[in-house]
Amino acid sequence: MIVKNESAIIRDTLENIIAHVPLDYYVISDTGSDDNTADIIKQFFDEKGIPGEIHHDEWVNFAHNRNCALQHAQGKTDYVLIFDADDRFEGNFVLPEELTSDRYYLRMANSVTGANVYFRTLMFRNDGSFYWRGVLHEFVEQRKKTVVEQKIFGDYYVISGRFGARSKNPQKYFQDAQVLEKAFYSPEDEDLKDRYAFYTAQSYRDADMYEKAIEWYAKRANLGGWYEEVYYSLLQIALLKIELNAPLDEVQNLLLAAYEYRPQRAESLYHLARQLRLHDKIKLAYIYANAAVSIPLTKDILFVDHSVYEWKAKDELAVSAYWVGNYQLCHDLCVELLFNPAVPEQNKKRFLDNLMLAKKHL
């Protein structure tokens, strides 16, 4: 772990970690705190009887400083767990009884609802085989030609938090975009240009600079490469165009282009059905909602909106089914949605109301 000025949350973070993962040793690098973060860390682990060490390293960039922490830890345990101060385990995380793989991916989500689920490397062998790359949105690279990898599934998420010290900076996303854009145009890390373009777009989006985000998502899509990033870039262009009140025809073409690029993903069709319904194109909405519902949960790992596959596409289909006169389908879907544990409670009154409306026609 690397930390800076996390005194407000670090104890809760550490409590959360040890409640889910047994720790034998800790290594944490402080990158320039001017509060008592390091003291809180030491006091916490002393109370728990867990040995370890805290280092103080000058800040350079994320990959550099994570590598510093990794070098401090090398050889002191069999595996290392990587964790950010504002991340949290939610649910029932079960560590495999026997650790045999070189690298482990854990389920990440941006909220407890499970929307935008993806997998990230959070644990790997502590034998010098792995290192970090990237000035921002850094990732784990391997030195060995082949490694054994494993995804840890289960009823849990690691929630990627936004309440640490860095997130309190109102200019965070704009500044991140500037750093990533500079890295994109730098002659270094030529093989990371597609990644830098993608996260430049993400950062401009999160800074609410939608036109710039669209420009960079388009740049990322045109670079080709990893199909999941290309698909997500195409989808985001369409969704940002919706935010900018682009004409329906333009939005429809963009969402269909995303679907055509990756037809095993349902998100683009769900959003298309919703936009068509909102523009009173009910018959078309019904067709595309039907198509979205027919797509099973994807095996993709990047920013998958599980809620679309679990209930949102069915919700959209139920509404359009009612308006095209397929009252039985609307009725059946509403019953299913009412008993679907993935549906947030605040939506169920609407499903019950829709169910009653459909019943009147049966």
Predicted regions, residues:
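Acidic helix N-cap motif at the loop->helix transition within catalytic regions
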Residues: R11, D35-F44, N92
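Short, well-formed alpha-helical segments that are part of the catalytic scaffolds
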Residues: N5-V21, Y25
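A conserved acidic beta->alpha catalytic loop
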Residues: N16, S29-I41, E58-W59, D84-A85
